[in-house]
């Protein structure tokens, strides 16, 4: 994504996508998502979504959006090791 400021619509879409990443990370960790996938696939999904959240949280054009769930998922995802 470029350094240009995002529109309100883009911010809303990005925030929604962040919620999907949070849900996936938490779901993989609690076993409710990707349970039938290999440990490598689960780990890869968590790692990619953690990276996505880190990039998005670091953006400076957010307004009053609450990043608590994203930051919690980043922490949980970094601690996760698929087995």
For each predicted feature, which ranges?
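Charged, low-complexity interaction regions
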Residues: 30-44, 58-68
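Short amphipathic alpha-helical heptad-repeat segments
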Residues: 14-25, 41-53
């Amino acid at each position: 994504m470029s350094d240009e400021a995002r529109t309100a619509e883009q911010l809303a879409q990005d925030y929604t996508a962040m919620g999907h990443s949070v849900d996936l990370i938490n779901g993989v960790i609690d076993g409710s998502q990707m349970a039938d996938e290999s440990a490598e696939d689960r780990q890869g999904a968590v790692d990619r979504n953690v990276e996505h959240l880190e990039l998005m949280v670091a953006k400076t054009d957010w307004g009053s959006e609450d990043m608590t769930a994203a930051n919690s998922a980043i922490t949980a995802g970094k601690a996760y090791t698929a087995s």
